[in-house]
């Protein structure tokens, strides 16, 4: 993951500095000093929810951000910027064929062993955050400039969802007193089912952020920024419930309403012990950003 981020950043910087050098070779006219910039921007690239797993595999995802902001320059080369942006983070989790068993009771309070076989499970997660950045920007040159910015961001989760509806799950119930395993009674929650989809809950995120690139002065007071950015999440945003959910939930009142919870907020039972799928969730983004200011 870190190697991929470095690769994306290096490619972006080579492109940006090459472009900036080409512009710098042209004759520059001194531009009037601007102390205020209002900007619209967008960017994209690697934008993922990162987490470690106790079983299965996690894969990073791609996303982006859009927003508007304001820069105030104390002097020509140094300024402070803030704004509001919407950022999307994605990730996926996959798990090969796996079996889960646990004791529970049915609608008649009869004890049985719930057995489930999960085939080619895949879960996609998507989070949209409202982010507020605070960045210090340093820039060089007059007309065509290089710039670097560093600071932090606060992210408030607005929309967080998961979807595992394509997964295939085969359930059965073993009743020890009868010494019989029920496999096709879907009204009892036994048989073939699909995964689920739904909403998730995450905590507020805190980032350390950096951006570097070229700033091109255009006509009519417009300025174009093209740069590479990195947003690195500092805290664990997992919002663990007081009572952890089971990955597979048997609803004894409505057995056919079988539910598969997200791996981000659930645990699984194996050999009488419970284990969480994930231990820490942090957002991470790296990509190319374009800003237009006036």
List where the protein language model places each region.
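Cleavable N-terminal export/targeting peptides
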Residues: 1-34
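Short proline/glycine-enriched turn/loop segments at secondary-structure junctions
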Residues: 2-4, 218-220, 276-280
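Short glycine/proline- and aromatic-enriched beta-strand/turn motifs that initiate or cap beta-hairpins
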Residues: 25-71, 201, 280-285, 291-294
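Outer-envelope beta-barrel architecture signal
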Residues: 30-38, 49, 76-80, 126, ...
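Residues on the lipid-exposed face of transmembrane beta-strands in outer-membrane beta-barrel proteins
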Residues: 40-44, 64-74, 84-86, 130-138, ...
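Extracellular/periplasm-exposed beta-strand and loop segments of Gram-negative cell-envelope proteins
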Residues: 48-61, 89-127, 157-205, 237-249, ...
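Short N-terminal amphipathic alpha-helices
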Residues: 75-85, 91-95
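Extended, basic/helix-rich recognition subdomains
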Residues: 213-215, 222-243, 258
């Amino acid at each position: 993951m870190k190697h991929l981020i470095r690769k994306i950043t290096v490619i972006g910087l080579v492109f940006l500095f090459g472009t900036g050098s080409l512009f710098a070779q042209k004759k520059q006219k001194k531009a009037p000093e601007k102390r205020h910039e209002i900007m619209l921007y967008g960017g994209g690239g690697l934008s993922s929810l990162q987490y470690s797993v106790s079983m299965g595999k996690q894969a990073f995802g791609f996303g982006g951000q859009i927003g508007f902001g304001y820069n105030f320059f104390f002097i020509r080369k140094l300024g402070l910027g803030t704004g509001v942006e919407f950022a999307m983070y994605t990730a996926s989790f996959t798990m090969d064929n796996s079996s889960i068993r646990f004791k529970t009771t049915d609608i008649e309070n009869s004890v049985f062993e719930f057995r489930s076989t999960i085939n080619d499970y895949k879960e996609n997660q998507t989070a949209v955050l409202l982010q507020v950045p605070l960045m210090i920007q340093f820039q060089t040159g007059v007309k065509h400039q290089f710039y670097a910015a560093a600071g932090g961001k606060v992210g408030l989760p607005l929309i967080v969802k998961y979807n595992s509806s394509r997964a295939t799950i085969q359930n059965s119930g073993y009743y020890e007193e009868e010494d019989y395993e029920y496999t096709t009674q879907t009204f009892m929650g036994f048989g073939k089912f699909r995964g689920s989809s739904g909403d998730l809950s995450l905590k507020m995120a805190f980032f350390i952020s950096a951006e570097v690139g070229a700033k091109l002065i255009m006509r009519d007071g417009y300025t174009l920024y093209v740069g590479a950015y990195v947003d690195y999440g500092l805290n664990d945003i997992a919002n663990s419930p007081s009572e952890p959910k089971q990955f597979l939930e048997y609803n004894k009142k409505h057995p056919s309403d079988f539910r598969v919870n997200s791996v981000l907020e659930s645990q699984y039972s194996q050999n009488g012990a419970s284990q969480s799928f994930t231990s820490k969730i942090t957002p991470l983004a790296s990509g190319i950003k374009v800003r237009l200011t006036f």
